[in-house]
Amino acid sequence: MSSEYKYDEQGIFFPVFLLVGTSCCVLPLTYSTILGPSASKEKKNVRDPFQKYRPKDLKVQRKSIFRLRYIFLILGWLAIGFLSYKIANSRLKLNIWDPYEILGIAKGTSVDDVRRHYKRLSIKFHPDKVRNMVNTTREEVEKHYIEITNAYRALTDDKTRENYALYGTPDVPQHISVGIALPKWISESENSIYILGFYGLVFGIVLPYAVGKWWYGSRTYTRDHVHVDTVDEWFPKMETSLTLDELLSLFASSKELTSLVPNEKNPKEYILKLLFDHLNRKKTNNFNTHQILSQSDVVLNALLSVATAFGFANPVDNVLKLWQHIVQAIPLDAPFPLLQLPHLLMEDVKNLSIRNISSIPQFLSLSEEQTKDYLPNYSKNQLKEMREIANGIPRISVVAAKVLVDDDEYITVGAIANLILDLKCSYGTEVVPEVSTDGTETATKKDEEDAEKYHQSKDVVLGDVETLPYAWAPYFTQHHKTAWWIYVVDPRQNRVIVPPFSITDIPKTLRTFRIPFQVPPVAGTFSFQLHIMSNSYVGEDVISNLTMIVKDTSVLQEQLQEEAVSDLEDNSDIDESANAGKDFSDDENIGSDEEDESEYDPMDTDTSDGE
């Protein structure tokens, strides 16, 4: 069997190759862009209660990567359409092996005629007989003669001829052509300089540049996507206690922000000025402010990671509070939650605070008449808008909290405990009672079933999922994703023992979270604090007290053995008492039977009968 590699001369297979390659890139990117993770069946989109109140001129800073993605998708789909059209309208010329055509005779020719015709062809095309090889080579002549010989054998051999008549494929070595789905002009000598230039461009410039850029990025950027110079600037200034102003100064010194204003002599001071104008809600309409705020989430997330690495609780708290103030544009020295409502001015918020109305639920608990009395300078529509926005602001609620160890009734030294949290989103005036643990909680049947689900799914979350709308942040220059950060603090040492992690998509029903952590290495009673802080809203933080009783394994075993022995003794005493009571009751029954027999006189009946 001979084989031959050749390029796509007809231009049929090369478009197919391009179509497959383009589709492998365009289809997954289209799916991730249009559908994405938000299209999961587990998630439910909720109505955006802030939609009609959001600023119409909200400037959403879109990254260039998304613009390039859409351009790439448009060009990719145009290429897919063009290639599909070209393939659909092309005609493939099939080379079917036909011995009659090779010999140049009509189908159905008799065997004798085939033999006579073959003799004439063999004399004419035998490689040793061909003298004038003009525009041909000896290899081509030999190849042609072999085809003639195979065709002759296919028509003169009875079995082969029968196979060919029945199936159209004689039992002879077939000519197999293995092609390469590339156009023929690639292999032509006059185009070699362009092909070599293309290879040199791809493998000599583009590929080294991409690898170098990736390597440089991995060396100069952290996993939080900030420059290493930013982290080097922050680390020496991390202390046990950092105020909001000090953290704002660290935030402004990041390279991600200072690089946005390269023409400023003192970029940090300039950024601080823009940030203070933003926090005080001064209308500057400065483009640099929009750029700074568009990078704030990335920088603040990195600042939180650095604060967590040091383990101090106070900086972690203040980073999240700074995040809230920047998103809501609230001064650092005036953390009033009611400033998040539209139209409400600072002096009116202070007046409400004097009346002990400082939180969103307290504001919503006011009747319409009280609201009008306390806020007489606002129109009816403005007051209505305030209430609707306040009703749409979510806040996290802890429904239940337990510290448990899998398959163990007690928490022992060195074990891996799990903080089980049942959380939900509350709205309006709904208030969930404060939850705390005293260390005496035990696992219920539901906890055991949930633990089995955790092990099966290898997940830390159970329950419903609900996609929340973007945060109500009219002074922020882009849509902001609502999230809560959960971490556990040891208040005695002011240290973070469970690092913060963010959660989103909290439903109105219930969702259970499982947070594993290491039990202290010594026995005793330990008190912790559970912190749940929002990255979007001021005054919606939750702090719950946790108590954990840790027991020593050896002491616990002795106690359990003593309890087991005590239980056995109690059971034996109960059995002896029961047996003694049974013997006493048997004696009484015997005595009573004897008395009954002595009192019985059969003559009484006889006397009565005689009478």
From Swiss-Prot:
Sites bearing Phosphoserine, chain numbering: S566, S572
Domain J, first and last residues per copy: 98-168
Keyword entries, A-Z: Chaperone, Endoplasmic reticulum, Membrane, Nucleus, Phosphoprotein, Protein transport, Transmembrane, Transmembrane helix, Transport
Subcellular location as annotated: Endoplasmic reticulum membrane; Nucleus membrane; Nucleus inner membrane
InterPro entries recorded: C2_domain_sf (IPR035892), DnaJ_domain (IPR001623), Ig_E-set (IPR014756), J_dom_sf (IPR036869), Sec63-dom (IPR004179)
Primary residence: endoplasmic reticulum
GO terms assigned for molecular function: Hsp70 protein binding; protein transmembrane transporter activity
Cytoplasmic side: 32-69, 213-611
PROSITE patterns: DNAJ_2 (PS50076)
Pfam families recorded: DnaJ, Sec63
Gene3D superfamilies, sorted: 5' to 3' exonuclease, C-terminal subdomain (1.10.150.20), C2 domain (2.60.40.150), DnaJ domain (1.10.287.110)
Region named Disordered: 563-611
GO cellular component, one term: cortical endoplasmic reticulum
Signal peptide: none
Domain SEC63 residues, every copy: 200-503
Keyword Transmembrane set for record: yes
One GO term (biological process): post-translational protein targeting to endoplasmic reticulum membrane
Database matches in CDD domains: DnaJ (cd06257)
SMART domains per record: DnaJ (SM00271), Sec63 (SM00973)
Segments on the Lumenal side according to the record's topology features: 1-10, 91-191
Transmembrane segments: 11-31, 70-90, 192-212
PANTHER family referenced in this protein's UniProt entry, alphabetically: SEC63 DOMAIN-CONTAINING, TRANSLOCATION PROTEIN SEC63 HOMOLOG
Task performed by this protein: Acts as a component of the Sec62/63 complex which is involved in SRP-independent post-translational translocation across the endoplasmic reticulum (ER) and functions together with the Sec61 complex and bip1 in a channel-forming translocon complex. A cycle of assembly and disassembly of Sec62/63 complex from sec61 may govern the activity of the translocon. sec63 may affect sec61-polypeptide interactions by increasing the affinity of targeting pathways for sec61 and/or by modifying sec61 to allow more efficient polypeptide interaction.
Protein name as annotated: Translocation protein sec63
Organism per entry: Schizosaccharomyces pombe (strain 972 / ATCC 24843) (Fission yeast)
Gene encoding the protein: sec63
